[in-house]
Amino acid sequence: MRSEIDSLFPRSIGKANEDTANYEERYLLSEADGVSANYEGYIQTLHNTALIKIAQSHNLIIRVQFRPGDFCIKGNILAHFWHLDASPSVDEDTDIVAEIRACFAMGHERTVHQNILFLADELVEILARALSPGVNDPFTAINCMNWFHSSLKAYSVADTPSPYRYDEAGDMRVIAYPVSFDRFLSVICDQSRTYVASDRNTALHMMSILTELAAGCEHPERKMAFKHQLDLLYAAAQSQLAGAIDLEDAKAHYQQALKIIADPSLFDREKNAQRWIGGRA
C-alpha cells in the first residue's frame, strides 16, 4: 500500500498557480457539457494521459467527477468539460463525449489499480474478521495495523498533488482531485475503531501508532487529525473494554500519549527508553 501511495503522490506534479486556483469562478459546472455513464459499475481505471491528449486536441478543460474505486450509476456524470474555443458542431461534441467516456474503464468489482482506498478497505476487513468473536486473533489484527502505520506515515509526509494537470505546452487541461489525507485517515481509523477498541492489545497498539504519528508529524493540521483519532479511540475503549486493569492500561497510555504529543523532547526520550513507542531493540 505504501508503494501505491508513492505512485499516486509523485513529487514531480506541478502546483496550482494564480490562474488555476480560482478556476471555479471562471468555469461553472452549470456552463459545462457533461459525459454521462452508459452503464453502472465500479470505476476500475482512469486513463489520465489520454484525457490530457483529448483536452489538448479539442482545446478543452476536463473536470473528472469519479475516481477509480467509485461506484457509478447509469446516467451519472463521469466528467464535465468546457470548450476554450468557439462552440463546436453537434457531431464534434458527440465525438468528444465518446472519447472522454472511453477513458473510464468500468466493471462489477473494485480493483487495486489506481485505488489506494481499496487496499485500506481490504486491511480493515481482515482486521475486523480477525477480531470477530469466532476468530479472536489480535495478532493478525496488529499486523494489519502495522501496515496502516506505514501507509499513514507515507501519507502524512507527502505533498498532496495539485488537482490540475497540464499538457506539454503548460496549459491546464484536466482537473482531478486526489484522495485527501483526511479521507484516507478516516477510512482506516473510523472503519476499524469499533473492532480495535474492543480488545486490550489492539487498542493499546493503535494508541501507540497514533501517538507516534502525531508526535512525529510536522504538518499542524495532520498532527491534530492524528490526535483527534487518538481521542476517539480512547473514548471507544472506555466504553468497550470490560476489565478494570485493561481500562487502567488504556487510561495510562492515553495520558502519556497526550504528554508525548505536546512535548517533542519527551517523544524522543520515550523512544530511547524502548517501551511502547518506536522499536524494542
Q: Could you describe each region identified by the protein language model?
A:
Residues 1-60, 67, 76-80, 88, ...:
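Short basic (Lys/Arg) and small-residue
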Residues 85:
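Inter-helical turn/loop segments and adjacent helix faces that build the functional surface
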